[in-house]
Amino acid sequence: MHILVTGFAPFDNQDINPSWEAVTQLENIIGTHTIDKLKLPTSFKKVDTIINKTLASNHYDVVLAIGQAGGRNAITPERVAINIDDARIPDNDDFQPIDQAIHLDGAPAYFSNLPVKAMTQSIINQGLPGALSNSAGTFVCNHVLYHLGYLQDKHYPHLRFGFIHVPYIPEQVVGKPDTPSMPLEKIVAGLTAAIEAISNDEDLHLALGTTQ
């Protein structure tokens, strides 16, 4: 399969974003998949246009977006995105939407059509912290996952799409002893394992849910 993997530019006054750092270190061939890479701005208003133009000019079987989730201690494939922008902080264009629908003609939520449980289990099988997430937040990460679902629904019915959040890397938590992080090479290994699992036509039937 031809897979586009995206990462984000740094945001919130940070100098690094582990999502893009990890994406740049992925091999160009993973299993039977050919990997293209794209850096996205952390911008509500710009990401849709960039994704739209990229999909209009290239054929991809899968788009997998990667984002930073500071405070998480595991690599977390996302199950679902919701139709809301509700930004706790401004994006890199100083835009801070609050309680705004992403697409007025879109569904309340879009579920990733990738085998998210198989991807999560593949990460865990590498001896790495992995967990299935049921919330991509309400910042630009959720926005991108929702927009991909919207595009699949309205324009690209055969497109497979998903999102994975990754933790901070150690240099981001200097002076923050209680904040979890993960070495970049482990994030790269986890993403590689997840991408390999995309080959699964059907997801695994595993109890990876949560009680809260």
Curated annotation (Swiss-Prot):
Main EC class the enzyme belongs to: hydrolase
Record: active site: 78, 141, 165
Stated name of the protein: Pyrrolidone-carboxylate peptidase
GO molecular function, one term: pyroglutamyl-peptidase activity
Lineage: Bacteria, Bacillati, Bacillota, Bacilli, Bacillales
GO cellular component: cytosol
Annotated NCBIfam families: PRK13197.1 (NF009676), pyro_pdase (TIGR00504)
Swiss-Prot/TrEMBL catalytic activity: Release of an N-terminal pyroglutamyl group from a polypeptide, the second amino acid generally not being Pro
Family, similarity comment: Belongs to the peptidase C15 family.
Functional description taken from the UniProt entry: Removes 5-oxoproline from various penultimate amino acid residues except L-proline.
Keyword match Lipoprotein: no
Keywords attached to this entry: Cytoplasm, Hydrolase, Protease, Thiol protease
Subunit text: Homotetramer.
Pfam families attached to this UniProt entry: Peptidase_C15
Keyword Cytoplasm: yes
PANTHER family per the UniProt record, alphabetical: PROTEASE FAMILY C15 PYROGLUTAMYL-PEPTIDASE I-RELATED, PYROGLUTAMYL-PEPTIDASE I
